[in-house]
Amino acid sequence: MSPTVLLSFIIGYFLMLIVVSYLTSKKSSDNDTFFIANRSSKWYIVAFGMIGTALSGITFISVPGEVGNLAGSQFRYFQFVLGNAAGYFIVAGILLPLYYKMHLISIYEVIGRTLGKVSHKTAAAFFLLSRTIGSAFRLYLVAIVLQRFIFDEMGVPFWLTIVICLLLIWGYTFRGGLKTIIITDTLQTVFLVASVFLSIYFICHSLNFNISQAFHAIKDSHYSKIFFTNNFVTNKFHFTKQFLGGIFVTIGMFGLDQDLMQKNLSCKNLKDAQKNMLSFTVIFVIINLFFLSVGALLYIYANREGIAIPLDATTHLPRTDYLFPEIALNHFKGVPAVVFMLGLTAATFATTDSGLTALTTSFCIDFLKFDKNKTASEPQMVRKRTLVHIGFSVLILLVILLFNAVNNASVVSAIFKVATYTYGPLIGLFAFSLYAKKRNVLDKATPIICILAPILCFFIDKYSTVLFDGYVFAEELIIVNGLLTFIGLLIVSKKKPIEGIN
């Protein structure tokens, strides 16, 4: 399909989002609207919209691609998804009640109230680092596809593609913030979910499969193995590692992440927020299973038609991230190509827009103390918030350009590797603040501990086969990271004096 035609559909899509942004923010664009949507969001709208935020372009492209990669991933990712589901239940049962009880805007205020100001800013800084990297990775994923299949043929350089993407996001988020994003993410989730089912339909149609035949083709293929239970020590795909990693990555990347928790905190009350979480979890598991099914069908189709996995332009090695766009845009074309591109755009921008808003919120609340500023006028605060919003947009641009210069790994592996190192300290900090309330931590030592823990984890991971008799870490390394942070805080803390005793 012509790049111009694809681009015209994408432009139309963003014009729709900008119109929605105008309609949702014309009555109010103050900071209360931007940060917490006036705490008036409907739980079922939040639940559905969060699907698009949680899945992102990572799921849309890389998960189907990983099904048939040379490492033999197959459906092993579903083990991780089951761990995610367990993690969501933990978040709903433990963290949400805490956040609502404390009536928070930024969830990192929990750390400030229990451990101290330095610990508070350390937690927020680790979130800013984690979310900046995560948002940049996700936007990078869609940008390289847009570049390869649309902008390269137009002679547009990669850096300009990123600038255009960020300007579009900024255009529909800078006024309404979270209130706008809750609505736009719901619309984007509609496009995302529709594109999954339509992709399955188009692939099945090309293979002359009905639903039953497609199910049996996937089941009988060598792509559909879910549970890996052999070689616990050396197998990264072992169920225990994937399941535990899924739980703790969810706690870190969801429950301790301002982005996704900000949406939950916009619900009217705790009960609504918990209904939102439980509904979201069920849909999340089902949608991921469909994404894996898309992957299996893509490889079945590719094998039948003799389609090779496209090569990376830099490394000249097969890159599974490109298989889905290659088939959708160069082999199916027409309506399937448009469906794919809109689905990919929705998946990625639903994540990036809310990430940008959460970064702005955290910086404004945790560092600039907007909620405690009683002297500045509302217009002054809004102007300052807008500058912060622009600043993070520029930062994400720079990080993406850096990724483009050095990245040659699978995006899925890279994003969760980053999460393992940056969210571990958050887990340790929150765990200590919740379960070591009878101890006073040396507040100034917190940043050092939170930096040392990931460094130690890096070396533990690198030399694990030597240190632990051949053991190979997977996503469960985040548990070790959090535990090291907890132990470090324990070492630099002391028991609180008993009241009434000198």
Regions found by a protein language model. Name each.
Residues M1-N502:
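Membrane-embedded helix-loop-helix hairpins and adjacent transmembrane boundary segments
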